[in-house]
UniProtKB/Swiss-Prot annotation:
Region called Methylenetetrahydrofolate dehydrogenase and cyclohydrolase, residue ranges: 1-338
Protein name: C-1-tetrahydrofolate synthase, cytoplasmic
Reactions it catalyzes: (6R)-5,10-methylene-5,6,7,8-tetrahydrofolate + NADP(+) = (6R)-5,10-methenyltetrahydrofolate + NADPH; (6R)-5,10-methenyltetrahydrofolate + H2O = (6R)-10-formyltetrahydrofolate + H(+); (6S)-5,6,7,8-tetrahydrofolate + formate + ATP = (6R)-10-formyltetrahydrofolate + ADP + phosphate
Biological pathway: One-carbon metabolism; tetrahydrofolate interconversion
Tissue: Present in all tissues.
EC nos: 1.5.1.5, 3.5.4.9, 6.3.4.3
Residue positions binding NADP(+): 205-207, 230
Region of interest (Formyltetrahydrofolate synthetase), ranges: 339-968
Location of the protein in the cell: Cytoplasm
Species this chain originates from: Drosophila melanogaster
Length: 968
């Protein structure tokens, strides 16, 4: 770099931002002839004015969203001094405005791939609203600069150099980012007061950065534009015809006074160094226009320096603030640009899989964009399902949440009453027909029931999740991850018992903390074990026998082991098994059992976790057994916490699918409702509530009847999340009401008794108490209850009217008949209207009990309020376990009542709504990771069995088309 050029850079960097400093000494732009006729257009003054305007805009943004700051990143490869000067100027201007500007300096050795990766990281960073790549690239290896500028997201290309933004400008779409120097030129022309429309404009120079975009901007400002360049003939004649002359040819003082039309506006974009012995620096800055001559002819003229240069930086800042404003606008935008899928209901209504196959789902990436997700927040699993990154919660942390609706049911028949179908009909009605931002949030179904008797759980008829095969089978593998994590813990538990029984303390300790390359070191999880034991030493070689013995030996009591292996199929022969029968296990065997995967405590942990850190802590806290002194043994004690978290890391991200009408559906976690809390994940609901925004709706469901799933949704899930539901939808059917009125048993696979296919008002009247108890259950939590009567073809209008009248008299907010199974969202519009009105009532939600109550008192509160029981009675074994859990510090946890789903009582054969009965609690255990104490009311199996004729008989794969057949 020449000494003359270095002096030029110093002069350039010192060029003042304050207009008051211009006009004396070294800063004078030809002061001797400043008194002549042309008006000087001060870019410095205009840029200062723009910066002040931008500073006010940034201040307003921070008031609109607390702590919001526009972000600019300036990427530089190498360390060219001229680039450093320009970067410092940009950062100085940004800081003055209130923009968070950072210099991302990368080494000369960087490769094109590495540079593209860095730019992609910035593209995906929500804190960054503008990115510029400083040119030229000062690199050791060849890098395609055009590819680099096009790698910057068009939405963050504040230099305006991306091909997309250039193309938008070329066709007159000025909604993209405009190149900074040409935009600055246009602003200077406008501020001169000269009318652009109809004027003759000549642009001298055709560079990508200045000449070409300047010509386009003038053209779309309605000037008549001619572009000239080094090959243009009669150049002087053409420029002399211009009312507006923009010069960026790169030749010092090329344009003479004779080239300029008298009174013309002349914008000089050039900057050159010219020797000048009269200057202390030995040189001066000049433009592409002979300034002295132009002053005599032009009407308006920009100086060099102090003309276009400051405007380039100012317009860069303006683009950055503009980008940040668009980000804020998208964040605050209330209405999704959702393209719904039309339904064409057929009569008679076809099977679920035929309906699902007839509807072509939209690409899941399209749906994700429609609902406001950024590409970096979505991991695609093919074209129809995706995972959503938890980073979306950080991006939307300040966004107001929508209305929260829980769909529950009356005590169901073995056939189910259509909660999921009603939920899907409701969200299709809200999203596709009422045009409200609406998200369904569902549990992922277990494969066990899918291949057993119940079938799938995607909804039914014209109110479904699609593709239903993906939904009902593997989806994205979350349940498999839960199974793997659960069984890893089970394997470590039995293995630890084996090793402790076959080794003495010292040998056990030496194997747990081995010397690696001559050095022994505790792992982080072992340090936590030491801390739990009150041992402060960190050097393994310093522990005494009294210290390393308790550290190495968990001393698990096999009779207290609560942890079971799992598999996600119905297998009755795994309900009781013996493990450790191989001779290699040296006679250390025990009786245990398998549960179905969704019954694992890890599934409940997944559903109740609020973050990765929260999940990891919950996994650590899981109690697998008690030691021989009665102290709890945890997953952390077994050293397995980190490994479990690794297996479950991706499973914590909710899955995105869609309804038959193209509205979004979140599918995540699937704990059973009779043995766990029976709700989808807190994280899925939270993501949904943020995405739908203030006026939107997230509709989720709670398993089985309100006495089971909804009670746990409120007392466990909402207590954990801190969210308060705005309304409860109570799903009922005439069929279920008749059953509770004394109707014949409803048996899967068997024809319905004619009591259910003919009008029978007497049975309906007798069965209403069951429905009314469920209405009371919702009211006990302060929620407005909307009864949705899921219409069946055998129902009669008189039966419907009887149910609606009774529901309203019992205090339901509304009672409507819904036909979503046959009609899709259109059949649930009345339900949607009722839900909207219910959510406008104001939130009066309250919990049922305080955690400080003793465990048995909490059980009694649930049983008497939710079930109508007189009291709970604990078996001696349950009483002993309550005492043990209370002594161990678990007395302040919420209660998860595990009981049959087909009755308010502990006996599934007792229907209706009995009062004052005794509820027997046979067993009590803690799910410390999930954060609740389970009370077992009677025998509830955690491993279903296959029926005589399971659904597998009808399920097949068409090897010609690859389609799955027979799912329902």
């Amino acid at each position: 770099m020449s000494a003359q050029y270095q002096r030029f850079l110093k002069v350039l960097e010192k060029w003042p931002a304050e207009k008051s400093k211009v006009g004396s000494g070294e800063w004078t732009a030809e002061p001797a002839i400043k008194m002549s006729g042309a008006k000087i257009i001060s870019g410095t003054a205009v840029a200062k004015s723009i910066r002040e305007e931008l500073r006010n805009e940034v201040t307003a943004m921070s008031k609109q969203l607390a702590d919001f700051v526009p972000g600019l990143r300036i990427v530089q490869v190498g360390g060219r001094e001229d680039s450093n000067v320009y970067i410092r100027m940009k950062i100085k201007a940004a800081t003055e405005i209130g923009i968070d500007a950072a210099h991302v300096q990368l080494p000369r050795s960087i490769t094109e791939v590495e540079l593209l990766d860095k730019i992609n990281d910035l593209n995906e960073d929500p804190r960054v609203h503008g990115i510029i790549v400083q040119m030229p690239l000062d690199c050791d290896t060849p890098i395609d600069s055009h590819r680099i500028t096009d790698a910057v997201s068009p939405e963050k290309d504040v230099d305006g150099l991306h091909t997309v933004n250039e193309g938008r400008l070329a066709i007159g779409d000025l909604g993209g980012f405009l190149p900074c120097t040409p935009w600055g030129c246009l602003e200077l022309i406008r501020r001169s007061g000269v009318e652009i429309a109809g004027a003759r404009a000549v642009v001298l120079g055709r560079s990508k950065i200045v000449g070409t975009p300047a010509a386009e901007l003038l053209k779309w400002a309605n000037a008549t534009v001619t572009v000239c360049h080094s090959k243009t003939r009669n150049l002087e004649e053409i420029t002399r015809s211009a009312d507006i002359l923009v010069v960026g040819i790169g030749v010092a003082e090329m344009v003479k006074g004779s080239w300029i039309k008298p009174g013309a506006v002349v914008i000089d974009c050039g900057i050159n160094v010219k020797p000048d012995a009269s200057k202390a620096s030995g040189s001066k800055l000049v433009g592409d226009v002979d300034y002295a001559e132009a002053l005599q002819v032009a009407g308006h003229l920009t100086p060099v320096p102090g003309g276009v240069g400051p405007m380039t930086v100012a317009m860069l800042m303006k683009n950055t603030v503009r980008s940040a404003a668009r980000f804020l606008e998208r964040l605050a935008k209330s209405q999704w640009a959702l393209q719904t899928l039309p339904l064409k209901p057929q009569r008679p209504v076809p099977s679920d899989i035929v309906i699902a196959r007839a509807q072509k789902p939209k690409d899941i990436a399209v749906l994700a964009k429609e609902i406001g997700l950024e590409a970096r927040e979505v991991s695609l699993y093919g074209n129809k399902k995706a995972k959503i990154s938890l980073s979306v919660l950080e991006r939307l942390k300040d966004k107001e949440v929508g209305h929260y609706v829980v769909v529950a049911g009356m005590t169901p028949t073995p056939l189910g009453e259509g909660k999921t179908t009603t939920l899907m009909g409701l969200v299709q009605a809200l999203g596709a027909h009422k045009l409200r931002n609406t998200m369904a949030a569902l549990r992922q179904p277990s494969q066990g029931p899918t291949f057993g008797i119940k079938g799938g759980a995607a909804g039914g008829g014209y109110a479904q999740v699609i593709p239903m095969e993906e939904f009902n089978l593997h989806l994205t593998g979350d349940i498999h991850a839960v199974s793997a994590a659960n069984n890893l813990l089970a394997a470590q538990l039995d293995t630890r018992i084996f090793h402790e029984n076959t080794q003495k303390d010292k040998a056990l300790y030496d194997r747990l903390v081995p010397a690696i390359k001559g050095q022994r070191k505790f792992s982080p999880i072992q340090l936590r074990r030491l801390q739990k034991l009150g041992i402060t030493k960190t050097d393994p070689d310093t522990l005494t026998a009294d210290e390393y013995g308790p550290f190495a030996r968990l001393d698990i009591d096999p009779d207290t082991i609560m942890w079971e292996r799992v598999v996600d199929i119905n297998d009755r022969y795994l309900r009781t098994i013996t493990v450790g029968q191989s001779p290699t296990e040296k006679g250390i065997s025990r009786e245990t059992r398998f549960s179905i995967s969704v019954a694992s405590e890890i599934m409940a942990v997944l559903a109740l976790s609020r973050s990765l850190e929260d999940m990891k802590q919950r996994l650590a806290d899981m109690v697998v057994a008690f030691d021989k002194r009665g102290k709890p043994v945890t997953a952390d004690d077994l050293g397995v916490t980190g490994a479990l978290a690794v297996l479950l890391k991706d499973a914590l991200e909710p899955n995105l699918m869609q309804s038959l009408e193209g509205t979004p559906v979140l599918v995540h976690a699937g704990p059973f409702a009779n043995i766990a809390h029976g709700c989808n994940s807190i994280i899925a609901d939270e993501v949904g509530l943020k995405l739908v925004g203030k006026n939107g709706f997230v509709c989720t469901e709670a398993g089985f009847g309100s006495d089971i799933g909804m009670e746990k949704f409120c007392n466990i899930k909402c207590r954990t999340s801190g969210r308060k539901p705005n309304a409860m939808v109570l799903v009922a059917t005439v069929r279920a009401i008749k059953m509770h009125g004394g109707g014949a048993p409803v048996t899967p696979g068997a024809p319905l008794n004619k009591q259910y296919t003919e009008e029978n008002l007497e049975l309906v009247q007798k069965g209403l108490p069951n429905l009314l108890q469920h209405i009371e259950n919702g009211k006990a939590f302060g929620m407005p209850v909307v009864v949705s009567l899921n219409a069946h073809s055998a129902d009669t209008p008189a039966e419907h009217e009887l149910v609606k009248k009774a529901a309203l008299e019992a205090g339901a907010f509304a009672a409507v008949v819904s036909t979503h199974w046959a009609d899709g969202g259109a059949g649930a519009v009345q339900l949607a209207d009722a839900v909207i009105k219910a959510c406008e009532q104001g939130n009066q939600f309250r919990l049922l009990y305080d955690l400080e109550l003793p465990l048995v008192d909490k059980m009694n509160k649930i049983a008497t309020t939710m079930y109508g029981a007189g009291k709970v009675v604990l078996s001696p074994a349950a009483e002993e376990k309550v005492k043990r859990l209370t002594d161990a510090g678990f007395g302040n946890l919420p209660i998860c009542m595990s009981k049959v789903s087909g009755s308010f009582t502990g006996d599934a054969k007792i229907k209706g709504a009995p009062k004052g009965f005794t509820l027997d609690v046979e067993d009590v255990y803690v799910s410390a990771g999930a954060g609740f104490v389970v009370a077992m009311c009677g025998e509830v199996t955690k491993m279903p069995g296959l029926p005589t004729r399971p659904a597998i008989y009808d399920i097949d794969l068409n090897t010609e088309t690859g389609e799955i057949e027979g799912l329902f």
